[in-house]
């Protein structure tokens, strides 16, 4: 008998990221490949700038989810 090959399942490169606002310290979850600018819910500072592919994150990354 021949050994079966392991079936590879592709995984997405994008993730959800928990970031902290540099001005007020508020934490919120954003998408790593965001297509729209994301603002802080407390102070309104822009935290994520869309860049065509992966978004530019201004705040401090606290945790990567998933």
Swiss-Prot record:
It holds the Pfam family Ribosomal_S27e. GO terms for biological process: translation. It comes from Sulfurisphaera tokodaii (strain DSM 16993 / JCM 10545 / NBRC 100140 / 7). The lineage of its organism: Archaea, Thermoproteota, Thermoprotei, Sulfolobales, Sulfolobaceae. Binds 1 zinc ion per subunit. The gene is rps27e. Its cofactor is Zn(2+). Gene3D superfamilies: Zn-binding ribosomal proteins (2.20.25.100). Part of the 30S ribosomal subunit. Zn(2+) binds at residues 21, 24, 40, 43. NCBIfam families: PRK00415.1. PANTHER family: 40S RIBOSOMAL PROTEIN S27. Belongs to the eukaryotic ribosomal protein eS27 family. This is Small ribosomal subunit protein eS27.
């Amino acid at each position: 008998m021949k050994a079966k090959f392991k079936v590879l399942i592709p995984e997405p490169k994008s993730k959800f990221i928990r970031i902290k606002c540099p001005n007020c310290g508020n934490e919120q979850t954003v998408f790593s490949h965001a297509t729209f600018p994301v603002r802080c819910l407390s102070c309104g500072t822009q935290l994520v700038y869309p860049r065509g592919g992966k978004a530019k994150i201004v705040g401090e990354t606290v945790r990567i989810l998933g």
